[in-house]
Amino acid sequence: RYPALEGIMIAGYATKFAQAIDLTILSELPNLHSLSVNICEGRGYLIDFSKFRLKEFSGAWFSHYQGLESLIELEVLRLSAYKAANLEALSHMSLLHTLVLWDSHVPSLAGIERCTRLKDMDLFRVKGLTDLSPLAQHPSLERLHLLSNRHLTQVQALNTCPKLRKLCIEKCKHVADIVTLEGATEIARITLDQVQSISFLPELPKLEFVYLEDVFDC
């Protein structure tokens, strides 16, 4: 009935239905490329993503949703409430260039290294995440924003990202090896908030912009 429809956004609070609503029916729209499902309580909805051919998805992930790993044509993923041991479910998304992960529990980024076109990445309030080692030598990562990752202690992997130009680290108080960023010599813009030291900044030859707030040791 709506052959030209390319994007759908569903938002709000889910109502208690007598029977769960299966949003998988939306996959029958032939030109649907973008889907946003921002529902505060998703028990009233079902989605099987293996039926979709999306380029963009945004929303909370509930345990009864299925088929995230099937979205192999995805280019943009904004995901919250995601709970998994790692990011292996994303490893087949070879076209993915933008990833936003927030309010989730993911102890390891393993799997993201196979998303070789990834350019932009935001990690906000990701519980359990201690290091960024799967990002080591990532060939295309250009921008990374880290916010309120309370368990994060290691960022040394960023030294080997050849295209990383924009870095923001905010409220990640327990990063112990931040001085090792002196090896990330391609960085041009950096924002640091509540970090242990900025002694490495003079070692960044391409630096164009610096924003500092609540630095513990200058």
Segments predicted by a language model, with ranges:
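Concave beta-strand-loop units of leucine-rich repeat
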Residues: 1-27, 31-67, 73-88, 92-108, ...
